[in-house]
Amino acid sequence: MGIPPNSTAFILSGGGARSAYQLGVLKYIFSEMGCVPESPIFVGSSAGAINAYFLSLRAHHGFSKAIIDLCNIWSSLTVDRVFRTDSWSIVKGVGNFVYNFTIGRYVRQRHIESIFNTEPLYELLKNIIVSEYHFLDKNIEAGSVRALGISAMQYGTGRTITFFQASEKSGIQPWTLLRREGRPAKLRLKHVLASAAIPLVFPSVKIENSYYADGSVRATAPLSPAIHLGGSKILGIGLRTIAQQSQPIENYPSMSQVIAMMLNTVFLDSIDFDVRVLERVNELIEKLPKEERGKLRPIDPFLIRPSEDLGLLSLPYKDCVPKTLKFLMKGLGPTDQRGADFLSYILFDKHYINALIEKGFQDAYAQREILHHFFKKSNQRMKDLP
């Protein structure tokens, strides 16, 4: 069974709590539009890896049910179900860093894995995923999912490794480029956790003989794995609004603003840039005579972005943060509009999560005609537009 001529790939990147926005978009596509992708490809990194893995795991139930189940899981989240928020855990995590930076050079340094203890997230995902590994294997072998790719950054080399699982019949081969590699694997919980391991914030994860960090770090070409896995149509879900109303700051930036800027650079910018590059490459390919194109083929991308700043969307829910974390955030800087971006990454609260899902659903609905045309070109089965 080869790759169909119009394989649709879904790119689910990271962004902490913001990644719930993806669910709203997919909920509209799978449930409201009734789009049933034929052997789709899912590529995930960071929190998007969790979403990609779950949808592939539950594909045998149908994507419309799988996305509803995933929305329910996200809606049940609280910050302390992702990482420990008790006073001792927070003080220990931050204190160990302070210790090593100050007196650690004079006495024995402490082994530090991360600021936050993410054991709750591990337990949550283990209870959901581990007992259903066999469903993922069956779904991929049956063709319900053409391929699943989970990206992580390899410490030491700095290479982005995309671990992928696909049927042997698919003909998908490993790939090696300058800073990127595609490596076949039986995808398990460790791959998901590695992809979501934000450096310093969450602990790195060991796979075979190497340690890995968040897959969005140094991911300069996030569309590349989808193309290597056979996607000729790519739907990406961005987390930065087109009309970003950012203004230069007049006062010296707070620590929370600095951290937010770094996170924005890691999570939000790469996919927008890569889509623009792909569109330009497509233009060049289209100008070539067909007999001169060789193996070159145009890739049809579509990127959905939020119509509203997801950072500002978090402000009405800032009091939902646990007291210990709120105390830490105040030490890093303002918790008003100036600190909204940082807040939006860690605000795993059902009220904010539901607001993100609803916003994603509304934005997909607003672009329903474009989406309908995009999927109809792929001969996907779907409901007629109202």
Task: Kindly give the residue locations of the regions a language model identified.
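Patatin-like phospholipase
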Residues: 1-43, 50-386
